[in-house]
A protein has these predicted regions:
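Short terminal targeting/anchoring segments
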Residues: 210-212, 418-438
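Periplasmic alpha-helical coiled-coil/stalk elements that build and connect Gram-negative outer-membrane
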Residues: 19, 140, 156-272, 383, ...
Length: 460
């Protein structure tokens, strides 16, 4: 074939892959450029923030062991991983339409008359067929690109599940510690109340107390037993939640009291840029979805233009296998085909409108994800200082209550106050100890939330 005859095919191939998709531009972030870190502790002079791996952030070795186990066995993470594999296969399936398709075939037939001349007629044939869509206007290219972005979005979704799992396992473990510590305090308080009851009962025998004080002492004992039963149920539920996250029902680690040194504090630069949110997998997933919607506009635009496909083949046919591949038995064909959209009652325009509206929806979704992420970080930053102040005040209040209880007991022994004063001091001390535990747990959870909101938890 002469070069002149090859030229049209070269031009066609050069044009293949042109795209009508709009140029992608990342939307501006609809949030302030920096987070407000005024009056916030743990601010350093670093120029930027770097996420620590979760093995560094979590100091407690037991937490690290549980997270490692969950990353292997958790069903939600397995499902997310399988969805990534499915999306990858779907992308390969869609992308295959952009390339030539080559198929071979072969057949044989035997026929004859039932009566008369009963000679058998034989016919053998082979063929090789090729087809290719000349993607002049990028319909297939943009469809493939949209599927690729969907696949990458699924990968980001899997990362988000990974990060959430790391956070949930740590929070569930600390919740187990909290439930155990609350149970320990309730049991210790019950023992103190029982000692007080024995003391009041002894005073009643000597006439130094009365039946009312004894009944009051018995009442707080029963109330504390009820609280113990409640705490036991909470501990069992915390264990069940942890086992579900781990994806296995083996022996859990022995619950321990809350340890404030189980994780590092998130240290932040003085000028923390909101650009750090762009590394969060949920925001990256939303941007991938936006890119896919952008590519779908290109595919919808291409539907307004002609589509050309080429089909060709070679075949042979013979009544004898020995001569099947002789040149004299061969044939060839070449079938170019063009389809021009003329009238479809507005179908193509409707498809384009849908693609453009979905692209606008993806922009709104992307912006909303950023705003939600900004709020998560801002909330965690605001709560950090508040919790520190609450804990400091609660610790001072606890110290004051301990002194109050000691004095109330001394005054009661000398008959200066009623037993009700002692009960009030004991109940206040009991409630304050529980509140302090809750606040320490809330501070740990808030630090984990801040770490996760800034995109931490993916790297080890």
């Amino acid at each position: 074939m002469s070069p002149c005859k090859l030229l049209p095919f070269c031009v066609a191939l050069a044009l293949t892959g042109c795209s009508l998709a709009p140029d992608y531009q990342r939307p501006a972030m609809p949030v302030p450029q920096q987070f407000s870190l005024s009056q916030n502790g743990l601010v350093n002079a670093a120029d930027n923030y770097q996420n620590a791996g979760w093995r560094t952030f979590f100091v407690d070795n037991q937490v690290k062991t549980l997270i490692s186990e969950a990353l292997v066995n958790n069903r939600d993470l397995r499902m997310a991983t399988l969805k990534v594999q499915e999306a990858r296969a779907q992308y390969r399936l869609t992308d295959a339409d952009r390339y030539p398709q080559l198929n071979g075939e072969g057949s044989g037939s035997w026929s004859g008359n039932l009566k008369g001349n009963t000679a058998t007629t034989r016919e053998f044939s082979t063929g090789l067929n090729a087809s290719f869509d000349l993607d002049f206007f990028g319909r297939l290219k943009n469809t493939s690109e949209a599927e690729r972005q969907n696949y990458l979005a699924t990968e980001e979704a899997q990362r988000a599940v990974h990060i959430l799992l790391v956070s949930n396992v740590a929070q569930s473990y600390f919740n187990q510690q909290l439930a155990y510590a609350q149970l320990q305090i309730a049991e210790e308080t019950l023992r103190n109340y029982q000692q007080s009851y024995a003391f009041v009962e002894k005073q009643l025998l000597t006439g130094s107390s009365n039946v009312l004080a004894l009944e009051q002492a018995r009442g707080v004992i029963e109330s504390t037993r009820s609280d113990i039963a409640k705490r036991q149920g909470e501990l069992a539920q915390a264990n069940n939640a942890l086992q579900l996250l781990l994806g296995s029902y083996g022996k859990l680690p022995q619950a321990q009291t809350v340890n404030s040194d189980s994780l590092q504090s998130v240290k932040l630069p003085a000028g923390l840029s909101s650009q750090i949110l762009l590394q969060r997998p949920d925001i990256m997933e939303a941007e991938r979805a936006l890119m896919a919607a952008n590519a779908n506009i290109g595919a919808a635009r291409a539907a307004f233009f002609p589509s050309i496909s080429l089909t060709s083949g070679i075949s042979t046919a013979s009544s004898d296998l020995s001569s099947l591949f002789n040149a004299s038995s061969g044939m060839w064909n070449f079938i170019p085909k063009i389809e021009i959209p003329i009238f479809n009652a507005g179908r193509n325009q409707a498809n384009l409108d849908i693609a453009e509206i979905r692209q606008q929806q993806s922009v709104v979704n992307y912006e909303q994800k950023i705003q939600n992420a900004f709020k998560e970080v801002a909330d965690a930053l605001a709560l950090r200082q508040s919790l520190n102040d609450q804990i400091s005040a609660q610790q001072r209040y606890l110290a004051s209550l301990q002194i109050t209880l000691q004095r109330a007991r001394a005054l009661y022994q000398h008959g200066a106050v009623s037993y009700l004063e002692v009960l009030d001091a004991e109940r206040s001390l009991f409630a304050t100890r529980q509140t302090l535990l809750d606040l320490n747990y809330a501070r740990q959870v808030n630090e984990i939330s801040l770490y996760t909101a800034l995109g931490g938890g993916w790297q080890q």
